[in-house]
Amino acid sequence: AVTTDSFVVNPLFFKGGNIGKLAVCGTVNDLLMRGATPKYLTSAFIIEEGAELNELKLIAAAMSSAAKEAGVIIVAGDTKDIEGNGGIYINTTGVGFIEGEDFASAKSEIGDAVIVSGSMGDHHAAILSHRMNIKNDITSDVAPLCDMVANLIKNGIEVHAMRDVTRGGLGTVLNELADASGKCFE
């Protein structure tokens, strides 16, 4: 399985992570949602003039740490400088191997349970809170879901489909699962 994604987040740093951790975890989790074991990542940075070197170092360190936690190797990278105001954008491509079942959206069945991995909305709430300078204890839950998915499989849980709810929210994901499988949610 192969997936690619671009990450543009403002602020670059937020409670619980930064754009580097988000890029690695997002790509790893996309592979996991297909039933693939993530193995390799590539990364390309687009860096606007004025970006802080210390921020780049922290972002790269977060990527390295997240890759190690997920058991993946970052095998290639690229950087491009562009005019701008210090923004940093990251594109990652991930490669993983499907050893068992491909968890395709079309495999959802009537009677399937919908299980979420944690509280909903923490990541976006943490980012929005930072943008709006709202003081609270909300922390992004950005993390590789390798152990969680491995435990589902190891414990014989019959998985038909998995999705990362990051983009579009739960309602969008449920609609996509229903459309792909020709079913509906009631």
Which role fits each region the language model picked out?
Residues 1-186:
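Helix-biased detector of long, well-ordered alpha-helical tracts
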